[in-house]
Amino acid sequence: MLYYFNTLAMMLRMQRVESCHTEEYGDEPEAIAVVPGRFHLLGEYLWFAQGNTLSMAIDQTLTLCVSRRKDSTFRLFSLTLGERRKISTANLRYRKEDRWANSVKAVILSFMDGGYHLTGLNCTILSQIPPDAGLGTPNALKVAMALVLGRLFAATLPKESVVSIVEHANERYLKTHAHRADILCVLFAKQGSCVRTDHRKKQAELCQFPSEGKRIVLTDSRVPRFIAREEFTARLKRCVDAYELVKRNPDMPRAMSKLMAAALEEIDVPEGIRRRVISLVRESLGVDEAIEALRKRDFAAFSRVVNRSHERLRDRFEISCPELDWLVKRALEFVDPDAPDVVCSRLTGRGFGGCTYAILRDQDFEPYLERLDEYERIFGFKAAAYEVQCSEGARVL
């Protein structure tokens, strides 16, 4: 029943964005891309060491409608934000004040670097993905833009090429890391499955998720995230530097999942950094354990991996905060002593705010939402909860 209502809601959103596009520009869309949001269940910090990431596409989507222009101008209209931008292929440099439009510019530049000839486009964007919650809105927009450009200006554009184009946009023009797990997840996802990103092989693999009798809840802590990017980036950089020191030893394995904590005793780094790198080593092993548990349909084993991961992120990697820990603790209060470890919860993303996810039994969903009323009384602002499902990946209509 929930799937039916979600499908109906998606159809209504598409009708709305198509109608607004025609009203804004006077022409009908020639291509429409629908891209899901995503959240990471485990391993989102392991890309630099060629580890694995386990992610899930969700049924909250970004829709992009486009129609061709006869000039080189790109007109962008965000229905979600009520904002308009006008850019030209002659001037696509990054400008801080352009904010979300920089994602579009980066993908256009990446296409041009690939030798594609582009004309201008009229673009209308409607995003249902909660903003500023770490659920992949910027990369959803980039993937959507790459898909519609491919539909209109490339004879064929396989998904692997879309991955390369968006990664190039991120690394060269937005000066971030590739965000490979984000891109592969939303491109290759299937309803009812998680996506494992193998950063070493640059591949995605589906892993069925047993959702019967369960509810998946994302809870946005609404903690102001102005410190999250800077603090998380600095912390991860120190871990990358420590890992690079380990790799200088020719006897050390290349993949983090094969790196033993004992190897870190041989390098000269502060104890805090050593502790965080060891937590990432354990996280990498945990991803493999979680996937094996899902394949065996052993949700109790999967839940144990998830709950221990949050403990490591809180105590060893130190990227949690009181608000996130409170949300996780409320979810875990529904663990049944007679059937332990069938409820799990963890922060997802950069930490220092953002979201938690919880996988609850059907009967625990409404009581969990009721407990969120206490959150505002304790912290002074409301949390926002979203029930989600494993979604299909991106598509072009």
From Swiss-Prot:
<dbReference type="InterPro" id="IPR019539">
    <property type="entry name" value="GalKase_N"/>
</dbReference>
<dbReference type="Pfam" id="PF10509">
    <property type="entry name" value="GalKase_gal_bdg"/>
</dbReference>
<comment type="pathway">
    <text>Carbohydrate metabolism; galactose metabolism.</text>
</comment>
<keyword id="KW-0547">Nucleotide-binding</keyword>
<dbReference type="InterPro" id="IPR020568">
    <property type="entry name" value="Ribosomal_Su5_D2-typ_SF"/>
</dbReference>
<protein>
    <recommendedName>
        <fullName>Putative galactokinase</fullName>
        <ecNumber>2.7.1.6</ecNumber>
    </recommendedName>
</protein>
<dbReference type="Pfam" id="PF08544">
    <property type="entry name" value="GHMP_kinases_C"/>
</dbReference>
<dbReference type="Pfam" id="PF00288">
    <property type="entry name" value="GHMP_kinases_N"/>
</dbReference>
<keyword id="KW-0479">Metal-binding</keyword>
<keyword id="KW-0460">Magnesium</keyword>
<dbReference type="GO" id="GO:0004335">
    <property type="term" value="F:galactokinase activity"/>
</dbReference>
<dbReference type="InterPro" id="IPR014721">
    <property type="entry name" value="Ribsml_uS5_D2-typ_fold_subgr"/>
</dbReference>
<keyword id="KW-0963">Cytoplasm</keyword>
<keyword id="KW-0418">Kinase</keyword>
<feature type="binding site">
    <location>
        <position position="78"/>
    </location>
    <ligand>
        <name>ATP</name>
    </ligand>
</feature>
<keyword id="KW-0119">Carbohydrate metabolism</keyword>
<keyword id="KW-0299">Galactose metabolism</keyword>
<dbReference type="GO" id="GO:0005829">
    <property type="term" value="C:cytosol"/>
</dbReference>
<keyword id="KW-0067">ATP-binding</keyword>
<dbReference type="InterPro" id="IPR036554">
    <property type="entry name" value="GHMP_kinase_C_sf"/>
</dbReference>
<feature type="active site" description="Proton acceptor">
    <location>
        <position position="182"/>
    </location>
</feature>
<comment type="function">
    <text>Catalyzes the transfer of the gamma-phosphate of ATP to D-galactose to form alpha-D-galactose-1-phosphate (Gal-1-P).</text>
</comment>
<dbReference type="InterPro" id="IPR006206">
    <property type="entry name" value="Mevalonate/galactokinase"/>
</dbReference>
<feature type="site" description="Transition state stabilizer">
    <location>
        <position position="38"/>
    </location>
</feature>
<dbReference type="GO" id="GO:0046872">
    <property type="term" value="F:metal ion binding"/>
</dbReference>
<dbReference type="InterPro" id="IPR013750">
    <property type="entry name" value="GHMP_kinase_C_dom"/>
</dbReference>
<comment type="similarity">
    <text>Belongs to the GHMP kinase family. GalK subfamily.</text>
</comment>
<dbReference type="GO" id="GO:0005524">
    <property type="term" value="F:ATP binding"/>
</dbReference>
<dbReference type="GO" id="GO:0006012">
    <property type="term" value="P:galactose metabolic process"/>
</dbReference>
<dbReference type="InterPro" id="IPR006204">
    <property type="entry name" value="GHMP_kinase_N_dom"/>
</dbReference>
<keyword id="KW-0808">Transferase</keyword>
